[in-house]
């Protein structure tokens, strides 16, 4: 397996992690609602809130190995906690009822027209309103909500009743249900969590009272409240500009938003609440693992939220009031449905059993009634026993992952509905301080938050006013492997079930929201997984095919035995000992660097401004030392500490490592001559035959020297033999496009047909060119043309210059080799052509031929009649 495949397996390790848990490690819990029903059946006396929360209450856990670490408690507070010590905190203190003045009589209670409790009495409503709150309340959002619209027109006398002891209480206290949802909740707190939280709360209150002793800037952190204007003072008049001046009045939502933002609230005296949402996607569980193992502290409140979709069929009509009535009557007639509805009171705000829930079994009433008798539905196609079982599994998983030295409060809630709605309800109820979410983005260059995205994590960060922790699931493999090592498979079970090599990671057998389990990864205990992944990785093909066939198809072949956990030779390195040595050095250097960084953090002698520079120096020094240690390995190879074969293997391994790091570059640097942009790009795989063909083709277009100059011929032959590359033609800047083929150089033939001996001598020196050169009768032979080539090594080839005029008369070649220059013969009167000069007065001047044509042979000049002396007379 190559490095990329191995990294992908590590990043996806959270999908295949399992936990092996003993039965005695699970926390036995008790259904508090069932216990309360049992107590009520035995004793009709009302139980106070303190008696439920008392650790010495009659709620005991069953079983031989029962453990009372976590005690039942309420999920959230429905009453404002505005003071340090509330009367509700005192044990055995019941609700005293609505306080009415002493002059109130029973006659006024039954008087609907006048009296203290009449609808027109403003004094009563001013002191006992639904939304009354105390000044300086430190718990925002936990106040009583206003009455629903359906009960605003009810007379005030119908909201009270007289109890058995004569006390007048309100029937609708504390509030009517405002959050109606289908949810089941388990809430447990550690045994000493309540005592620790009371101690911490008193410490916070003491620091608030002594601000100047504990805070450097108390006036900024705790600004004084503005005093209210006295009755005699003139009230401040707010300026409201007219509408015609361009002012747009604020809407109701804008006014409400402005009022909420401008309202000053105090610091909450509730525990630090951490909300974590999980679903069927496996990467969401990584965020829960990280929060339970890293984020939580003592006295924290961890809330685990999970939602399930509704299974109600919406394709049947519900408009008929009679059908709705029959369904409600059918639910009320079934005693099991009534008892199920009583047990579904998961929240203290949802106490009414008259909440209408549609059956989701079918549109026909007969089918609904028949199936409802055999299937007790809690809501939307789910049974209460099924949800409670999953709820218990989630709670067991949470209590198992939490470290033993953490004293926290745990709330696990399963809601039926859409994710957005459930999150909004959970935020409004629990008022979390932090939200923990996960993402599949893992690259360091990739942003974990995208502002224009509809993903849940992006919406939480952009729209919700809550600090959010984003956990990249694909980078948390160290955390998951640590969990696997802590909850590994017992040795006895491993010996019974394993008959051969077994992969460490394996898939989960169920896709539901049950407890994920972890299997053991066969690695050394001192391995650092970010570096040792280079050493201990499975092979791409796999040597143990028998064990692979025995394993299931959904198991990940991530780790094998020690014999098979070496990478392929071509993957990273070609020697096992070199890899082990590199990993050991990297692990040792990392541990040393981590220790130095930890010492720098706890060193009080270092100024705060220099601490980061000190850490940077430690990192740079460790990196340089590690580089020197790697060089020492290569030095030991060069010094002959190992045999030749092993040294060659190590060297090839390092070269392969360099190739992987550089992205496919050649392992060794080969010095190549500098190439010019004017060079012809030759094929690098050229053979000797191609170079010979280039040499022969070059010799065919060379200049043919005169027969009387054998020295020049030898020089030209040696020069052509030394060249190995095909040249490229380079023209001068004065060459015109209209010149055509004439710009290629002199095309006048140098062959002389007068002397056959000279032809034989020339053939003796250039026999290979005469055999290869094409000879077409009536056409001239091409003259040689030199070019500029940079690839000629140390030879200085100059550019060939071509002169052009209106009529191309002569061509000069400027070569670097002086031996190649051929002196042109002197033209005398004996060589004049008939067309070289015209008749007339100036015919006696000697001139050269103006015709550039080479069709005229030199033997024709001998047969041509020659002109004599002056005025055509012969020479005397």
From Swiss-Prot:
Q: Biased composition, Low complexity: where in the chain? A: 49-58, 717-726, 794-808, 842-854
Which residues does the record list as Phosphoserine (modified residue)? 48, 51, 360, 510, 552, 577, 775
Q: What GO molecular functions are on record for this protein?
A: RNA binding
Record bears the keyword Phosphoprotein: yes
Please tell me one Gene Ontology term that the record gives under cellular component: spliceosomal complex
Stored InterPro entries: Ser/Arg_repetitive_matrix
Q: GO terms for biological process?
A: regulation of mRNA splicing, via spliceosome
Give start-end of the signal peptide. none
Polar residues compositional bias, start-end: 115-131
Keywords of the record, alphabetical order, are:
Phosphoprotein
Show the ranges annotated as biased composition (Basic residues).
689-699
Positions of region (Disordered) = 37-67, 112-155, 226-254, 330-353, 490-513, 661-728, 750-876
Q: In what ranges is there compositional bias, type Basic and acidic residues?
A: 37-48
PANTHER family, alphabetized: SERINE/ARGININE REGULATED NUCLEAR MATRIX PROTEIN (PTHR23148), SERINE_ARGININE REPETITIVE MATRIX PROTEIN 1 (PTHR23148:SF0)
This chain belongs to the protein called Uncharacterized protein JIP4
As recorded in Swiss-Prot or TrEMBL, the protein's gene is named JIP4
């Amino acid at each position: 397996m190559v490095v990329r495949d191995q990294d992908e397996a590590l990043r996806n390790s959270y999908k295949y992690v399992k936990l092996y848990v003993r039965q005695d490690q699970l926390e036995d819990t008790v259904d508090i609602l069932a216990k309360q029903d049992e107590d009520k059946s035995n004793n009709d006396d009302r139980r106070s809130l303190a008696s439920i929360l008392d650790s010495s209450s009659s709620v005991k856990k069953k079983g031989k190995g029962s453990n009372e670490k976590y005690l039942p408690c309420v999920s959230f507070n429905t009453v404002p906690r505005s003071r340090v010590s509330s009367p509700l905190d005192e044990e055995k203190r019941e609700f005293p009822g609505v306080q009415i003045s002493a002059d109130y009589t029973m006659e006024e209670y039954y008087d609907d027209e006048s009296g203290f409790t009449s609808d027109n009495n403003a004094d009563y409503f001013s002191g006992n309103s639904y939304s009354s709150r105390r000044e300086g309340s430190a718990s925002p959002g936990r106040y009583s909500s206003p009455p629903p619209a359906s009960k605003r027109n009810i007379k005030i006398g119908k909201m009270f009743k007289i109890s058995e002891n004569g006390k007048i209480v309100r029937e609708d206290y504390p509030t009517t249900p405002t959050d109606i949802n289908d949810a089941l909740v388990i809430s447990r707190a550690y045994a000493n969590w309540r005592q620790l939280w009371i101690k911490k709360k008193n410490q916070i209150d003491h620091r608030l009272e002594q601000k100047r002793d504990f805070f450097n800037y108390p006036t900024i952190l705790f600004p004084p409240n503005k005093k209210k204007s006295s009755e005699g003072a003139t009230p401040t008049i707010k300026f409201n500009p007219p509408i015609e001046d361009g002012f747009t009045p604020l809407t109701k939502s804008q006014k409400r938003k402005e009022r909420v933002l401008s309202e000053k609230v105090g610091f909450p005296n509730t525990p630090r609440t951490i909300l974590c949402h999980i679903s069927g996607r496996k990467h969401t569980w990584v965020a829960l693992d990280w929060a339970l193992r890293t984020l939580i502290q003592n006295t924290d409140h961890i809330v685990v939220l999970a939602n399930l979709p509704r299974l109600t069929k919406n394709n049947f009509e519900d408009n008929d009031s009679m059908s709705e009535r029959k369904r409600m009557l059918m639910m009320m007639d079934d005693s099991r449905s009534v008892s199920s509805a009583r047990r579904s009171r998961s929240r203290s705000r949802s106490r009414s059993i008259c909440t209408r829930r549609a059956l989701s079994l079918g549109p026909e009433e007969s089918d609904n009634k028949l199936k409802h008798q055999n299937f007790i539905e809690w809501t939307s196609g789910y049974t209460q026993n099924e949800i409670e079982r999953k709820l218990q599994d989630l709670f067991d998983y949470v209590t198992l992952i939490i470290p033993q030295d953490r004293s926290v409060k745990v709330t696990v809630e399963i809601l039926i509905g859409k994710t957005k709605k459930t999150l909004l309800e959970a935020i409004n109820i629990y008022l979390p301080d932090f939200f923990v979410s996960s993402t599949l983005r893992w690259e360091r260059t990739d942003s974990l938050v995208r502002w224009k995205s509809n993903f849940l994590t992006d919406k939480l960060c952009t729209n919700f006013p809550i600090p959010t922790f984003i956990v990249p699931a694909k980078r948390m493999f160290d955390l998951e492997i640590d969990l696997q090592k802590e909850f590994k498979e017992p040795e006895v079970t491993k010996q019974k079930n394993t008959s051969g090599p077994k992969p460490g990671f394996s898939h989960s057998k169920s896709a539901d929201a049950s407890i994920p389990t972890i299997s053991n990864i066969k690695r050394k205990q001192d391995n650092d997984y970010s570096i040792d992944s280079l050493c201990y990785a499975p092979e791409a093909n796999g040597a143990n095919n028998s064990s692979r066939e025995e394993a299931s198809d959904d198991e990940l072949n991530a780790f094998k035995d020690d014999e098979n956990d070496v990478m392929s030779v071509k993957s990273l390195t070609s020697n096992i000992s070199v890899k082990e040595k590199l990993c050991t050095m990297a692990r040792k250097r990392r541990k040393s660097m981590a220790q130095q960084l930890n010492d720098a953090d706890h060193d009080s002698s270092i100024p705060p401004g220099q601490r980061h520079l000190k850490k940077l120096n430690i990192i740079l020094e460790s990196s340089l030392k590690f580089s020197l240690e790697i060089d020492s390995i290569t030095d030991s190879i060069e010094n002959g500490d190992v045999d030749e074969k092993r040294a060659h293997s190590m060297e090839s391994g390092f070269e392969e490592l360099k190739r992987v790091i550089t992205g496919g570059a050649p392992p060794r640097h080969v010095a190549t001559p500098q190439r010019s942009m004017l060079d012809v790009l030759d094929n690098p795989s050229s053979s000797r035959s191609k170079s010979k063909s280039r040499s022969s083709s070059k010799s065919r277009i060379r200049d043919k020297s005169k027969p009387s100059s054998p020295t020049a011929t030898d020089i030209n032959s040696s020069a052509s033999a030394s060249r190995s590359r095909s040249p490229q033609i380079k023209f001068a800047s004065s060459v015109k496009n209209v010149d055509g083929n004439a710009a290629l150089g002199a095309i006048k033939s140098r062959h002389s047909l007068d002397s056959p001996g000279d032809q034989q001598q020339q053939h003796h020196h250039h026999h290979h060119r005469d055999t290869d050169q094409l000879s077409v009768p009536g056409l001239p032979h091409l003259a040689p043309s030199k070019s500029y080539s940079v690839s000629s090594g140390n030879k200085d080839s100059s550019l060939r210059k071509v002169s052009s005029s209106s009529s191309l008369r002569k061509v000069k070649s400027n070569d670097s080799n002086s031996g190649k220059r051929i002196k042109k013969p002197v033209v005398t009167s004996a060589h004049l052509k008939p067309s070289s000069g015209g008749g007339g007065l100036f015919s006696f001047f000697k001139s050269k031929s103006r015709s550039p044509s080479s069709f005229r042979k030199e033997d024709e000049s001998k047969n041509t009649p020659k002109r004599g002396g002056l005025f055509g007379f012969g020479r005397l």
